[in-house]
């Protein structure tokens, strides 16, 4: 039976890989995507890099939607009636959240709250996946798990923690399976130029062409778990198609110093 998948933030790297993952497993399913800055040709070009078959506008439907407006979100949910929802939307820069007067915090929490209200009001029977973040974790020298201590140190992480706590309260209510993926850093060829790995790659390319550039980054001693966005999207898909309400850490399990 044909299923409908709603992906918020579909044009980001995770959304692109997730779209590909869903259609590889279920080519007849329908994907509904939302984006604040949708460029059809750019999105299709990136998707075609990953897929070996063409899609049409009936299979993938993407629209500019303001998820900060509750009425708009209610209409989106009632009109589409998705079987699976993946909330990947919202600001993703920890650094910017430190100086944007809580805009990042407000946007992340408002988008989730609007989706939760709309789902509840529509009496949907669906699976919901929330993109959470390893930024919630307290500093630790040992391996982290779903049971590790949470201690956010930025407005971005605080927003993710608030949603994480709300999810625990929502589990078991109604016909919704609420899951979350506590994701570590992950990169791909579709990552934005403002992020560390792409900064380093672009710097190397400019140096190769003899352009004078200065690479500005933070401490080289920081240790991060970097994975591949394609692997993360595969995990997201597998988590949400299971009829369970669980939290999962998604990472490579290996830390690397930035200097490496």
In which residue ranges do the predicted regions lie?
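Conserved internal alpha-helix within the Rossmann fold of NAD(P)-dependent oxidoreductases
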Residues: 70, 111-113, 236
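Active-site YXXXK catalytic motif of short-chain dehydrogenase/reductase
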Residues: 12, 108, 156, 160
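SDR active-site strand-loop-helix element
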Residues: 8, 34, 85-89, 128-133, ...
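Conserved Rossmann-fold NAD(P)-dependent oxidoreductase catalytic core, especially the SDR/UDP-sugar
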Residues: 4, 87, 113-155
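NAD(P)-cofactor binding segment of oxidoreductase domains
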Residues: 16, 20, 99-128
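N-terminal Rossmann/SDR dinucleotide-binding element
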Residues: 1-84
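Active-site segment of SDR-like NAD(P)-dependent oxidoreductases
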Residues: 91-95, 133-142, 150-153, 184-188, ...
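NAD(P)-dependent short-chain dehydrogenase/reductase
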Residues: 142, 165-240, 253-255
């Amino acid at each position: 039976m044909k299923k409908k998948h709603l992906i918020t933030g579909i044009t980001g790297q995770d959304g692109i890989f997730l779209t590909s993952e869903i259609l590889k497993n279920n080519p007849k399913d329908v994907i509904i995507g939302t984006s604040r800055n949708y460029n059809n040709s750019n999105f299709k070009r990136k998707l075609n890099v990953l897929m070996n078959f063409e899609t049409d506008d009936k299979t993938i439907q993407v629209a500019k939607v303001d998820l900060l407006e509750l009425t708009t979100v209610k209409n989106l949910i009632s009109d589409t009636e998705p079987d699976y929802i993946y909330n990947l939307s919202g600001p993703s820069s920890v650094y910017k959240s430190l100086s944007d007067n809580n805009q990042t915090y407000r946007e992340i929490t408002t988008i989730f709250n609007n989706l939760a209200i709309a789902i509840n009001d529509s009496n949907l029977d669906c699976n919901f996946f929330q993109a959470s973040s390893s930024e919630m974790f307290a500093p630790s020298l040992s391996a982290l798990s779903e049971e590790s201590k949470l201690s956010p140190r930025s407005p971005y992480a605080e927003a993710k923690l608030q949603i994480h706590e709300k999810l625990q309260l929502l589990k078991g209510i109604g016909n919704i399976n609420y899951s979350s993926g506590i994701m570590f850093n992950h990169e791909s060829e579709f990552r934005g130029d403002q992020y560390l790995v792409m900064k380093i790659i672009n710097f190397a390319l400019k140096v190769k062409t003899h352009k004078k550039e200065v690479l500005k980054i933070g401490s080289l001693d920081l240790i991060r778990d970097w994975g591949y966005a394609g692997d993360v999207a595969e995990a997201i898909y597998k988590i949400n198609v299971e009829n369970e309400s669980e939290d999962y850490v998604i990472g490579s399990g290996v830390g690397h110093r930035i200097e490496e």
